[in-house]
């Protein structure tokens, strides 16, 4: 069952070798749900990457609850118009930090460079932020994050939920979350992108 399901979700086989039981449990969570974001095909999109290619781990909370926003990568959307506020703020800080102006909300190019954009919770009910908290996702994603951190990846941890994972990273950048509620409480001016690049042998082209 695991093999056929992983093919359906386009998960890199390296993850299945590392965490066969954990993925079986994660697939069961998805099958138990009715209506949720992102689309089922995108729930495990972050795992399309080879685990050996991951150099940076960006930890989010859960997918965007608005229809059409979530696409399986933390903070990312599949379009360039009407970006969510958190992503707008992320891009404002990117401009301030590195002088990079970005309007494309699809962060797949970051993923292609070894940036692992994972939410602690991989699904969300329609229009109900954090509505799938404590249904099993946190245990699954914590094991993944721990593996990557202990393997030497740099952690970019924005917000309290992400900061809970700090213990697994020897190299990390911790800042406030870019949401409108907290962006002015430590995120703006934190220069997280240059800070992450300073910890890498090959910097990310944000």
Model-derived segments and spans:
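Short, Lys/Arg-enriched, disordered terminal segments
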Residues: 1-7
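A polyanion-binding, active-site-adjacent surface
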Residues: 10-156, 161-165, 171-174, 180-183, ...
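Charged phosphate-binding loop/patch that engages nucleotide di/tri-phosphates or the phosphate backbone
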Residues: 198-206
């Amino acid at each position: 069952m695991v093999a056929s399901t992983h093919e359906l979700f386009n998960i890199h086989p390296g993850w299945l070798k590392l965490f066969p039981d954990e993925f079986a449990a994660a697939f069961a969570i998805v099958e138990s749900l009715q209506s949720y974001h992102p689309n089922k095909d995108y729930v495990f999109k972050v795992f399309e990457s080879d685990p050996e290619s991951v150099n940076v781990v960006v930890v989010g909370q859960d997918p965007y609850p608005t229809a059409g926003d979530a696409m399986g990568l933390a903070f990312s959307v599949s379009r360039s118009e009407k970006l969510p506020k958190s992503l707008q703020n992320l891009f404002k800080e990117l401009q301030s930090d590195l002088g990079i102006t970005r309007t494309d909300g699809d962060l797949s190019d970051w993923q292609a460079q070894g940036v692992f954009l994972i939410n602690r919770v991989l699904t969300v009910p329609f229009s109900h932020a954090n509505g799938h908290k404590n249904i099993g996702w946190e245990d699954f994603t914590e094991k993944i994050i721990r593996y990557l951190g202990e393997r030497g990846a740099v952690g970019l941890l924005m917000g309290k939920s992400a900061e809970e994972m700090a213990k697994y990273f020897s190299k990390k950048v911790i800042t406030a979350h870019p949401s409108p509620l907290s962006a002015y409480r430590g995120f703006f001016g934190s220069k997280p992108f240059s800070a992450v690049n300073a910890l890498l042998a090959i910097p990310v082209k944000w």
